[in-house]
Amino acid sequence: MGELQSIGNWWMWSGFGVFVLLMLAVDMFMLDRNGAQKVSAKEALIWSFVWFAMAMLFGAVLWGWLDHTAGREIADTKVMEYLTGYLLEKTLAMDNIFVFVMIFSYFAVPLEFQKRILVYGVLGAIILRALMIVLGAWLIAQFHWVLYVFGAFLLVTGIKMFVFAGHEPDLAKNPLLKWVKKHMRITNEYHGDKFWIMDKGVRWFTPMFLVLVLIEFSDVIFAMDSIPAIFAITNDPFIVFTSNIFAILGLRALYFLLADMAERFHLLKFGLAVVLMFVGTKMLIVEWFKIPVAVSLGVVVAVIGISILLSLIATRNKQH
């Protein structure tokens, strides 16, 4: 048993927490100011770039501070871990977005309601990841062998994802959705943006509630993938948390950017599967062979980049 070493102190954690709350407020204000109007691709692209720039700026500031206080070697290592974790989590977030698109399409969710659901989706993702990071860090500190459990889980998940990447899940057969429909009264129509209504003293849940349940359930599933994956890169809770949160903060802007382009990135899931298999293997062989962080970053960049490029080429060839 032991305690995980972290570069984060109380004021860094507090400062980052305040920053996250401010950025969430900015995100909600900027994307909701047009009401029910669709967020344009241009606006979504600008905000996606802003979030990316902020993540890179944080990395630069972190490197400068560590270089001054802890030395160049630690600064290089920690920022490399941060960048690798950020890229990995951003890719998982993109896959999460494609699931959101599928859910919204299945339930024909009106645009103005999508914005509200996405707020809960982002908040749920942040809260779940924070809780799972705390749990994961505690488990690793108490039981080092948990890393091997994480590694095996990621390896199996990656293999399953690769095998079934071309199969679109049938939401009508989703066990959770079937259970909710069986045990709760569900209306056939939307009632504004309400999750339930009262009719003659009886509570009825609306399709909005079903969408919310599936969105939050998808958050749980993706958190179960992402947290073990980031712990394959670093055991530092501060690096794990900051890279995760920066990857999620721009989720709504990224959704409006990619929502109409989900089909163009159909090979991304194969790339993500390969990455998960890589990080799972990395965790399983760490006792015998430690893969440098720079190599991990290179593998993640190469695999994701190639999968996106091949997706675009395949889509272009199909159009011609």
Residue spans for each PLM region:
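Multi-pass alpha-helical transmembrane bundle typical of ion/small-solute transporters
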Residues: 1-320
